[in-house]
């Protein structure tokens, strides 16, 4: 059985270390090590050996993905729905003009913290918390923001800090 994750504990830790994390990531941007992508991938893999997303699902409960047209088309097809019907049932346009869920938590998140559309989930969900992307220093603002929601993102930055 998966052990539940204390989301609030990680949120508080991320708040306490936000200034330190910003500094670490800013230094990476100024002078990224040649092997940064390799180090980041190793840390990402290690963190996700420790953190089981299904014991948390905080991203699914509190953050809504930005739906791209390809996401909408793929998911509507999965449900055998016409695009306008899918959008009318699940999506709205936010103040930035992005298509997002009408309400949170994610309507496709089950009580067991599993995604009912996992194989066709939006790209933003597949890539979250973006800690395995190349040139991680290009998304410092997003990485810092994600540490406040995602225990794995917090641990990623902590381990990155310790390795560099």
State the predicted function of each range:
Residues 1-164:
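Short loop/turn segments that flank or connect secondary-structure elements
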């Amino acid at each position: 059985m998966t052990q539940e994750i204390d989301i609030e504990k990680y949120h508080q830790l991320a708040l306490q270390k936000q200034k330190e994390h910003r500094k670490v990531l800013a230094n990476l941007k100024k002078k990224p090590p040649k092997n940064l992508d390799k180090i980041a991938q190793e840390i990402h893999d290690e963190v996700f050996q420790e953190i089981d997303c299904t014991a948390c699902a905080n991203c699914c409960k509190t953050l809504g993905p930005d739906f791209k047209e390809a996401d909408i088309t793929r998911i509507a097809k999965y449900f055998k729905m016409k695009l306008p019907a899918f959008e009318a049932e699940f999506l709205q346009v936010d103040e930035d003009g992005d298509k997002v869920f009408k309400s949170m938590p994610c309507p496709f998140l089950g009580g067991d913290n599993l995604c009912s559309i996992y194989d066709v989930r939006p790209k933003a969900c597949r890539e979250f918390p973006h800690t395995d992307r190349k040139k991680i220093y290009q998304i410092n603002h997003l990485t810092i923001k994600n540490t406040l929601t995602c225990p794995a993102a917090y641990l990623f930055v902590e381990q990155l800090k310790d390795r560099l």
